[in-house]
Swiss-Prot record:
Belongs to the Smg family. This is Protein Smg homolog. It comes from Herminiimonas arsenicoxydans. Pfam families: DUF494.
Length: 158
C-alpha cells in the first residue's frame, strides 16, 4: 500500500490531478502494482478524505485543542510506538502540522494495520495528509520526511 501512496505523490502534484478511479486503477496496474495493493491504497485515501472532511467540518477554525498536550491512549502508543509519537510531537512543535492534521495522521496511522508502524511509513502518512490537503511541505519537513538516518548529517548537540 505504501508504495502505491508514494507513487501517487511522486506522479501527481495534487490529488485533483489524479484521473478517475477506474483509469487510476488501470494505470497503477500497468506500472506493476498488484490489485490488492491498489485497492488497499485507494481505500486508505478515501478514508483519509472522509476523516479530513469530518474534522474540518467539526473544527473549521483549526484551533480546537491547540493549547493542550496530546495524551496518547495505550492503543495509540502500541500502534505508533515511541519514535512515531516523538516524530509527531516534533512536527507539531515546529508548527509543520497543526492539531487537526496531527489527529488525521494518528487516525490514518492506526488504520494502516501495522503494529508498531515504522517511522518511514509514518512519514509517508504525514506526506499524504499534507498532499491530500493541497499543502506543499516546506524545506524542513521535506528533509525530515525524506532523509534516512544514514543520509542525514550528524547533528551537533550543544
Amino acid at each position: 500500500m505504501f508504495d502505491v501512496l508514494v507513487y501517487l505523490y511522486e506522479t501527481y502534484y495534487r490529488p485533483d490531478a489524479c484521473p478517475d478511479s477506474e483509469a487510476l486503477v488501470k494505470k497503477l496496474s500497468a506500472v506493476g502494482f498488484e490489485e490488492e495493493e491498489i485497492t488497499k491504497a485507494l481505500g486508505w485515501l478515501t478514508a483519509l478524505a472522509e476523516t479530513t472532511n469530518e474534522l474540518s467540518d467539526s473544527y473549521p477554525h483549526q484551533t480546537a485543542f491547540s493549547f493542550g498536550t496530546r495524551i496518547y491512549v495505550s492503543q495509540e502508543t502500541d500502534v505508533l510506538g515511541t519514535p512515531a509519537v516523538g516524530f509527531i510531537q516534533f512536527l507539531e512543535a515546529a508548527k509543520l502540522i497543526n492539531p487537526i492534521q496531527r489527529e488525521i495522521v494518528i487516525e490514518r496511522a492506526l488504520a494502516a494495520g501495522e503494529t508498531p508502524i515504522s517511522l518511514e511509513k509514518l512519514k509517508v502518512i504525514v506526506l499524504m495528509v499534507l498532499w491530500s490537503q493541497g499543502k506543499e511541505p516546506d524545506g524542513l519537513i521535506f528533509d525530515e520526511l525524506f532523509l534516512d538516518d544514514d543520509d542525514a548529517a550528524p547533528r551537533i548537540l550543544h
